[in-house]
Amino acid sequence: MNILLIILASLFSCAGQLCQKQATTVSGGRRPLLLWLGGSVLLLGMAMLVWLRVLQTVPVGVAYPMLSLNFIFVTLAARWLWRETLSLRHALGVILIVAGVAIMGSYT
């Protein structure tokens, strides 16, 4: 259950970050900008609430490195949504993050 909450917190955080990115590229007035920023605040707030639940049951020294999942989620989403390039160095970094998270997460 803890790992699911950690993943959920990371996904909410990732979605909030993606809304912020989208807000920087929006044209067409103030309303779309405010919608993207509002979505970001809502998603980041949800991430915080889930994260507080995680911290009730998982040692912070174990839980905090799991937030590195955000690097993976944001990288993949940026590649998919905005066709951002993924260099070999960046891909290797993501792979190393996955390995580190797997090692840290093996406490359960």
Curated annotation (Swiss-Prot):
The chain crosses the membrane at residues 32-52, 58-78, 85-105. Belongs to the ArnE family. Residues 34-106 form the EamA domain. Heterodimer of ArnE and ArnF. It is a multi-pass membrane protein. It is found in: Cell inner membrane. The keyword Transmembrane helix applies. Keywords: Cell inner membrane, Cell membrane, Lipid A biosynthesis, Lipid biosynthesis, Lipid metabolism, Lipopolysaccharide biosynthesis, Membrane, Transmembrane, Transmembrane helix, Transport. Pathway: Bacterial outer membrane biogenesis; lipopolysaccharide biosynthesis. Its main location: membrane. The lineage of its organism: Bacteria, Pseudomonadati, Pseudomonadota, Gammaproteobacteria, Enterobacterales. Signal peptide: none annotated. It comes from the Bacteria. HAMAP family: Flippase_ArnE (MF_01869). This is Probable 4-amino-4-deoxy-L-arabinose-phosphoundecaprenol flippase subunit ArnE.
